[in-house]
Amino acid sequence: MNAKPDLFIPEDVFLRKGARRATEIPEHIRNWLQAGHIESVNLTEWLAIDHVSLFQKVTHEWGMDAETIEIMEQFKQLNGQRIMKIIPAIGMQWLNLLNRLPVNERMNLFRSIAEHRSDSVRCWAAYIIGLNSGLNLTEKLEHIRPFGADHHFGVREIAWMAVRESISAELSLALQQLIPWSVDPDPLIRRFAIESIRPRGVWAKHIQELKENPAMALPLLDAVKSDAHKYVQDSVSNWLNDASKTNPEWVRQVCATWTQQSNTQHTRRIVTRATRSLT
């Protein structure tokens, strides 16, 4: 249920930088993206994907036309919706379909979605996990972890978005369970631990408890106050910048403490970016 063995894609396609505007995406690149044959390489390409069309092509390739006729009819209601509404909607339809299958078939089909060559398809798999009411928070975090460490930027973003509502609903438990993630050897996992609990976040609902009491997350933040990876540093500084909108003095105090405890170039960069909104 993946790449066709006779499909040839030139190497330069995989090395492309990507168009700056959707209108500048070459037709052959757009066609390969829409067929699920290649990954997007930047946000412009990622946002240009027609997920409903991609769903139809993928399921047709997998011989699932009969099983998805009704789903395609329901997708007509998604016309004009933003991508951050469409991806969860497709994830939910996959979840409903998977739940009707025997266990072995369900596992094999989910694996095909989760390991698909298209980053957009893997995004659906993340929401299949996040929307699954049969999984508790611990199980969702366990299953979402590979997506949080995916090599593709889009899948990593969708990964934390897919479980953010579950994290917010059981915040204290989530903060405890994410502590080991904040010291994980993989910077992508450390970044997930911070990004998933940002008080305001991007394209996500605010977590009111953390806006009002950001100190709840201090054990995780302290663990990455001098992280060597800019990807993690940016997440930490953005987290504190979020908090500065409602608790500016707390952010100033944390940054002052960190500067005293860890006067490294990494901490200094985090502190500088964290206080960018403070006067």
Summary of predicted features, one role per range:
Residues 1-279:
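Surface-facing alpha-helical segments and adjacent helix-coil boundary elements at the starts of domains
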